[in-house]
């Protein structure tokens, strides 16, 4: 009995002391004018609130209660979620470059060669130099148009496959990924590389572990968690396989004389600049490998993800599909080839793509990191704090969008919004200094294939599924990919019938 009483007293005292500590912790935070957030648990912070949910969904719920600038404690990591266009504009434009860093994760550090790339590199001379080379040599509007014959060639290959599969179930997730990968390989590297399908799968797996939610990311001071992190071993196995593939690409380019265009491709340019004594930051071989992996990560995953979400939403909304196909078939009738200039006429289809990116942004949570202490919406954001811009949440906010949960492309006829980085409630490609440099290239790789898929085929869901039966869930990870593959049945369209 005495032991039970003593135990009860100890528990009561411990609870009282813990409550005092928590109150003192909250008081000290409020005195610092930090952003508001839900009550935290010791050690884990707010991790329990993310359990069983996708982070962008859980953080959207928090913003409804605590406001558009929300403090989220992820283990040891002080994080801030921005969920309004005003706060996002302040962080991505007015405070740029104070918020222009990327936060590091175990996934990006291992798979992207210590972040020696463009996507995950900190804001630095190296990042500026590599981005400039990328834009001028690969991703300019002129170059995007010059790649038209590659898009046409690879699209013809896909159309032939779909024609031969008429009436059969086709895994469109697999086919669109292959199409996008082939276009990117030929445009960037001069040819379709060996093991490209395996590399695409490695990219997908890498991005799923690059969001910064591994235990070793959330408790960086714990040597034990870092040592016991099972995914770390998996990442290193993946990295060794990636390195083997990328090393082969590098060696092949050292030996070859010219690419598909009969001249330099982007890797040849990087090798040439590697030898240039005038460049500001030396370009290492690892930086070239990281750039190649970037090209697959940003190009293949985001373009194919958007195309698949467009097709999924069209299948779920037959009236929208019918309207989009009517426009495409009227505008493209009689044309033997289709490319960037042709799709500019397709206003409704372009609105369909916009509406898809509103509801299914390629990167639901854009990752940033503070380079210095700053202030957003009057709240103090500490140096090195992790910042996550909830693009998914802003795309479904009724303050900015009428009927936000309805797929309604016509909204863009009524409200002039684009995704070029100036409308901060709609930034699927990011904004500010770190806006996606491949915006034009990626958009062309979505719109041109989409127009031809809508023109040449009528589509049905597999196995008699109804539109209302479709699973529109997203998978976990940095990119907002579909949780399940998209299975469709194509029927060739006869313009003369």
UniProtKB/Swiss-Prot annotation:
A cellular-component GO term for this protein: endoplasmic reticulum membrane
Reaction(s) the record says it catalyses: (4S)-limonene + reduced [NADPH--hemoprotein reductase] + O2 = (1S,6R)-isopiperitenol + oxidized [NADPH--hemoprotein reductase] + H2O + H(+)
Transmembrane segments annotated in the record for this chain: 2-22
Cofactor list: heme
Primary location: endoplasmic reticulum
Entry's Gene Ontology molecular function annotations: (S)-limonene 3-monooxygenase activity; heme binding; iron ion binding
Record-listed heme binding positions: 436
Signal peptide (residue range): none
Matches recorded under SUPFAM superfamilies: Cytochrome P450 (SSF48264)
EC number per UniProt: 1.14.14.99
Subcellular location as annotated: Endoplasmic reticulum membrane
Membrane topology: Single-pass type II membrane protein
Chain segments annotated as coiled-coil in the UniProt record: none
Keyword line: Endoplasmic reticulum, Heme, Iron, Membrane, Metal-binding, Monooxygenase, Oxidoreductase, Signal-anchor, Transmembrane, Transmembrane helix
Pfam family of the protein (one): p450
Role played: Hydroxylates (-)-(4S)-limonene to (-)-trans-isopiperitenol, a precursor of (-)-menthol. No activity with (+)- or (-)-piperitone, (-)-isopiperitone and piperitenone.
Miscellaneous comment: This gene is normally not expressed in wild type plants. Gamma irradiation induced probably a mutation in a regulatory gene, leading to the repression of the native limonene-6-hydroxylase and in the novel expression of this previously silent limonene-3-hydroxylase.
Family the UniProt entry places it in: Belongs to the cytochrome P450 family.
Protein name as it appears in the record: Cytochrome P450 71D95
Source lineage: Eukaryota, Viridiplantae, Streptophyta, Embryophyta, Tracheophyta
